[in-house]
């Protein structure tokens, strides 16, 4: 299997506080990898390290390497803006721009230099289709994105991430603000997206991780406790702490 990210001896510190410590992990291409663990265990810290968003936090210090496409993304000379084009992100709360549905999706391609109107139309349609939203919005692309439901807004944010033609899409608790029906649509979509993208998702929802992921990483107090194929980790975890967390006895 091809490796998307090779994370080596990777640590993140917020001042004197440990975010994550000495993480070694391979994340595979065209798979869904779930990162689970209790609040404050380092899940989102790791996720935001994969496209260098973590650097935007004041006082953060980073050690170790994240190898993506043969290079350490933290090396001097790596263009963080281009990296974030290749590694898209969808956040916990839908955050559409106060613009039209069309302009939300076209925003990234325009920033990256695509000006041709026909090409932009193609990208918008293709991205909305991949985000399973096209049929619901195709007749109102000029309407404000803020008029969409929460679930539709989240799928719009996924379309916006897709529009820059990334290789990886990171999801940070993407369904926690949604009702169960909208959440189920996002879950289906994440599984579908792995055909074309590498998907990494942080989730508090253990059942969600079991349903959608191929691989699962369990974090506890900033450390990676266990990582492996989801079926194996859930059915026969190697570590007692993993088993206790999955059965609700700690966490």
From Swiss-Prot:
EC number: 7.3.2.1
Keyword Translocase annotated: yes
Sequence similarity: Belongs to the ABC transporter superfamily. Phosphate importer (TC 3.A.1.7) family.
Residue intervals of the ABC transporter domain: 5-246
Subcellular location: Cell membrane
Subunit structure: The complex is composed of two ATP-binding proteins (PstB), two transmembrane proteins (PstC and PstA) and a solute-binding protein (PstS).
Main location: membrane
Protein name as catalogued: Phosphate import ATP-binding protein PstB
Catalytic activity: phosphate(out) + ATP + H2O = ADP + 2 phosphate(in) + H(+)
Keyword annotations: ATP-binding, Cell membrane, Membrane, Nucleotide-binding, Phosphate transport, Translocase, Transport
One cellular-component annotation, GO: plasma membrane
UniProt xrefs under SUPFAM superfamilies: P-loop containing nucleoside triphosphate hydrolases
Membrane topology: Peripheral membrane protein
Function: Part of the ABC transporter complex PstSACB involved in phosphate import. Responsible for energy coupling to the transport system.
Binding site for ATP: 37-44
Transmembrane domains' residue ranges: none
Gene Ontology terms for molecular function: ATP binding; ATP hydrolysis activity; ATPase-coupled phosphate ion transmembrane transporter activity
